[in-house]
Regions:
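RNA-contacting regions in translation and RNA-metabolism proteins
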Residues: 1-195
Length: 195
């Protein structure tokens, strides 16, 4: 079964996807068992695979996610988490849903998500275990589905004008709850007779 998909890449991100001497493109091709052709005039990245192996079924989709993530502002190193982590996924949030057509509103929302010297973005990343990129009119998030859900809620709250303090409190509470859930799971698996 052959696979082919086109991903539109902004011109300023084509060089990042190719990498120095084609290194990044080559790594994605090798790790995902795909062929990548990039048209620098149109910005189209054509990802194709001819593999018929069952284990290779998901690899072309991972390549699509990695290239999409890099095209939305992630560094290749951070985007490789999508290949390395079996449970990791990529989600894109369109900020136009909150800012409308106003460029001033868009800049204000992006500023709230990034924070002063990137503090807000780093705090969300640290408390959720995700990677976050604010690029153009979108926010990209890489992490597990649970991590993405919490980070997405934080981005949505900030986009709707909630205070940073209330967002950080929500993140702290979610982190505390996740820790308790992990401890309960560990106890249930290691001490079933105590229940």
């Amino acid at each position: 079964m052959s696979f082919q998909q086109v991903v539109r890449v902004p011109r300023d991100r084509i060089g990042v996807i190719i990498g120095k001497n084609g290194k990044v493109k080559g790594q994605i091709q090798d790790r995902c068992n795909v062929l990548i052709e990039i048209d620098s005039k149109t910005g189209d990245a054509i990802i194709s695979s001819q593999s018929k192996e069952m284990s290779a079924e998901m690899e072309p989709f991972k390549a699509v996610e990695v290239i999409t993530a890099i095209s939305k502002g992630f560094s290749p190193r951070r985007a490789y988490r999508l290949i390395d982590g079996d449970d990791d996924a990529f989600q894109l949030i369109d900020l136009r849903d909150y800012a409308g057509k106003s460029s001033n509103s868009m800049e204000r929302i992006k500023g709230r998500i990034i924070g002063e010297e990137g503090k807000s973005r780093r705090t969300i990343e640290d408390l959720t275990g995700t990677y976050i990129s604010v690029y153009g009119h979108s926010v990209g998030i890489i992490g597990t589905s649970d991590q993405i859900k919490i980070a997405s809620d934080a981005v949505t709250m900030l986009s709707k004008g909630k205070s940073h303090k209330s967002v950080y409190n929500m993140l702290q509470e979610a982190k505390r709850k996740a820790k308790i859930d992990r401890m309960r799971l560990w106890e249930d698996n290691n001490f079933p007779a105590l229940r």
